[in-house]
Each structure stands twice: as structure tokens, then as C-alpha cells.
Amino acid sequence: MNFLLDQSTDARLVTWLTKRGHNARRIGWDYPHGLPDHEVLAIAQREGRILITDDRDFGELVFRHRQPHTGVIYLRLASYSFALTTARLEDVLAQHADRLDRFLVVTPGDVRERRE
């Protein structure tokens, strides 16, 4: 799978995803740092990448402004430790692979699909 990580996410996730056979790129490394959110979402859409972010503003772009996307994984994790993040992503990739083209909200105990 192809992923784009927002600049606010832990940079170690690129290596973590790559070691699992995925193609992962990150804003701030592979693309300029500080891109506006709408440009980040447009890059992901253009390149067919699933966006991984912890920035809730992407929900507004998708649902309020109807910006197209190829999937968003919104990490809504209070303690944002790397171990928790990777454990939750492992669950998402294993249990929700058929829903990765949607807007998924990932919390410590749940994965839900956000709709309008």
C-alpha cells in the first residue's frame, strides 16, 4: 500500500511501514515542510496514497469542503506514544484493509468510519 504521512506524525512511522512492505513518504522529508493541508490532501489523492495524520483539520477538508481523497487515517490518540501508534496501525492494516479508502478515525480502543 502507498501512504503519505503528514508532517505532524512521528517520522519513525515511515521506516515502520516500509519494513512491512509498504511505500511510505512524508511531508517534510519527501515534500516541502509546511505545506497547507489542502495541498497535502491533493498530493495524496494525485499519487493514490492513504494519508496518515493526527491533524483533525483534514476532516473539515473532506466533509465540509468535499476535497477528494484516496483514504485518510486520522490518529486520534491521546498519549501518542510510538508503541500505541504502531499497535493501532497494525490493527487498522490487519482488520480494516477493505476500508482504507475511507476516512477512518483511530482511537486507543476503536476504529470507526467517519461519515458526514
Regions from the PLM with identified roles:
Residues 1, 115-116:
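Intrinsically disordered, low-complexity and often Lys/Arg-enriched segments
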Residues 42-44, 68-71:
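Short, hinge-like loop/turn segments at secondary-structure boundaries
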Residues 17, 62-65:
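Short, flexible helix/strand-to-coil boundary loops that buttress conserved ligand/catalytic motifs
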Residues 70-112:
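C-terminal structural segments of small proteins and small subunits
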Residues 5-6, 53-54, 77:
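Small/polar loops that bind or transfer phosphate-bearing groups
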Residues 2-50:
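N-terminal first-folded block
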Residues 45-62:
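Acidic, metal-binding active-site segment of PIN/NYN-like and related structure-specific nucleases
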